[in-house]
Amino acid sequence: MSDLHLDSNQFGDFERQALRHLLKEEGIDHLHIAGDLSNDLTKISLPFLETLKQEIPLSFNLGNHDMLGLSEQEISTYDFQVQQFGQTKLVSFSGWYDYSFVPEKSKEEHLRTKTNFWFDRRLERQFDDPSITAQTLRKLEKLLMTLDGPIIVALHFVPHQDFLYDHPYFQRFNAFLGSQAFHRLFVKYRVKEVVFGHLHHRHQSRIIEGVRYHMRPLGYIREWELTRNFFNDFPQYKIPQMYRLHKRYNALKDLVEFRDYKKKHLAAELRDALTVIEVQ
């Protein structure tokens, strides 16, 4: 799973119990969360994980939201973890971006967009974005060279251009989503499966040059399938600007009908955001 955004989604007792029940029902032996648990790793994410791991073994890697308030050294301690399940190894790390998904704009233009619009302007990274990505790629290749057997990779950022924004307004933000260079390494070292998130769109699993990609982030509640479906089932609550996700969610979030609807359909939403991989 990825992109639970516990704070933004107000993950309370009901949501946590629904998640625990789903994992048990699906027979999950190990849960990995590929970043963006919350905006506060220490006070929100780690206590959540500590409670959850009393019921199921789990691991995680950082997303950009998890990095808020962390030093570069603290960020690095969570990177490049390797776990073994049978013959299969799970490699987890955050990833990053180098603007290469939007090559037509200059570095200065990307920095202006980032400063004006993007969450990561709040982070205190030690190096610039292309340098962070280059360092990450070097570390990743050095690690992959040492591994044999089937490899699963979990990262937060987007490793292939097929998953980018296609809407003209949002295309400039593709610069901050990831880098195709990750995919090239996955192909080179015959990585079997890759799970990632960051961009809150869910895709069917697909194989690209021998690598099977899984992108099923939970995302923000305003983006959830159950939120969209609520308006179809209760059209009287539709607003004129339905394309504005914040506004349409604000119009329903306090409705008794929506609270009941969410309770009824939350399990299905969580299940749709779960990627299950059977290992050798």
In which residue ranges do the predicted regions lie?
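A short C-terminal boundary segment appended to hydrolase-like catalytic domains
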Residues: T133-L137, Y237-Q280
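Active-site neighborhood of phospho(di)ester-bond hydrolases with catalytic His/Asp-centered motifs
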Residues: M1-S2, L31-D36, L58-N64, T77-D79, ...
